[in-house]
Curated annotation (Swiss-Prot):
Protein name: Fibrinogen alpha chain
Major site of localization recorded for this protein: secreted
Gene Ontology terms: biological process: adaptive immune response; blood coagulation; innate immune response
Assembly mode: Heterohexamer; disulfide linked. Contains 2 sets of 3 non-identical chains (alpha, beta and gamma). The 2 heterotrimers are in head to head conformation with the N-termini in a small central domain.
Role: Cleaved by the protease thrombin to yield monomers which, together with fibrinogen beta (FGB) and fibrinogen gamma (FGG), polymerize to form an insoluble fibrin matrix. Fibrin has a major function in hemostasis as one of the primary components of blood clots. In addition, functions during the early stages of wound repair to stabilize the lesion and guide cell migration during re-epithelialization. Was originally thought to be essential for platelet aggregation, based on in vitro studies using anticoagulated blood.
Record has RNA-binding as a keyword: no
Keyword Secreted set for record: yes
Entry GO CC: extracellular region
Organism: Cervus elaphus (Red deer)
Length: 19
């Protein structure tokens, strides 16, 4: 949910990924 990893946005609809 950080927003820095767009590849994770497929499971985080807030548009970010966990780092």
């Amino acid at each position: 949910a950080d927003g820095s990893d767009p590849a994770s946005s497929d499971f985080l609809a807030e548009g970010g990924g966990v780092r």
